[in-house]
């Protein structure tokens, strides 16, 4: 018999750094999910990723207090800021540029994000990443 679904939730947790402190602990605890079990499983799954990279995670939890999680790749903005060597995007992206990235770097980011993007091919994924760069004030050369 299938488990009864209780709900889903989304968290953004740094890779390899899940711990019971806020915001992870309270978010899981109020839904009755075993916090330490989640932290151990999350840290084990993200140990091969870059430490501290923000990982969007979709947690599906069931009435018997069990859960499954799907860990996605870090946001395109994270990769773009890293490639452009900037701390944050522009406050007025249409008038101000904060950094530049090359087309090769955009392709590399698109290839890394391909499984999470709604694109059929690498060119479509590159257009999505280019849009993110434009909205952050990062110029592509």
UniProtKB/Swiss-Prot annotation:
Q: Which CDD domains match?
A: Ribosomal_L11
What modifications does the entry list under PTM / processing? Answer: One or more lysine residues are methylated.
Q: Which residues cross the membrane?
A: none
GO MF terms, alphabetically ordered: large ribosomal subunit rRNA binding; structural constituent of ribosome
Q: Does the keyword NADP apply?
A: no
Note the Pfam families from the entry: Ribosomal_L11, Ribosomal_L11_N
- Keyword rRNA-binding on this protein? yes
**Cysteine disulfide partners in this protein:** none
Coiled-coil annotation reads: none
Give the protein family: Belongs to the universal ribosomal protein uL11 family.
The subunit field of the Swiss-Prot or TrEMBL record says: Part of the ribosomal stalk of the 50S ribosomal subunit. Interacts with L10 and the large rRNA to form the base of the stalk. L10 forms an elongated spine to which L12 dimers bind in a sequential fashion forming a multimeric L10(L12)X complex.
| PANTHER family, sorted | 60S RIBOSOMAL PROTEIN L12, LARGE RIBOSOMAL SUBUNIT PROTEIN UL11M
Q: What does this protein do?
A: Forms part of the ribosomal stalk which helps the ribosome interact with GTP-bound translation factors.
State the name under which the record lists this protein.
Answer: Large ribosomal subunit protein uL11
**Organism per entry:** Dinoroseobacter shibae (strain DSM 16493 / NCIMB 14021 / DFL 12)
């Amino acid at each position: 018999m299938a488990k009864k679904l209780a709900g889903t939730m989304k968290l953004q947790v740094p890779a390899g750094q899940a711990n019971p402190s806020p915001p992870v602990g309270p978010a899981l605890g109020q839904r009755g999910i075993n916090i330490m079990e989640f932290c151990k499983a999350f840290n084990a799954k993200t140990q091969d990723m870059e430490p501290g990279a923000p990982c969007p995670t979709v947690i599906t939890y069931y009435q018997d207090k069990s859960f499954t999680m799907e860990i996605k790749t870090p946001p395109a903005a994270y990769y773009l800021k890293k490639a452009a060597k900037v701390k944050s995007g522009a406050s007025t992206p249409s008038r101000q540029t904060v950094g530049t990235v090359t087309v090769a770097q955009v392709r590399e980011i698109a290839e890394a994000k391909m499984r999470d993007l709604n694109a059929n091919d690498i060119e479509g994924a590159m257009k999505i990443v280019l849009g993110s760069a434009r909205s952050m004030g990062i110029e592509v050369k």
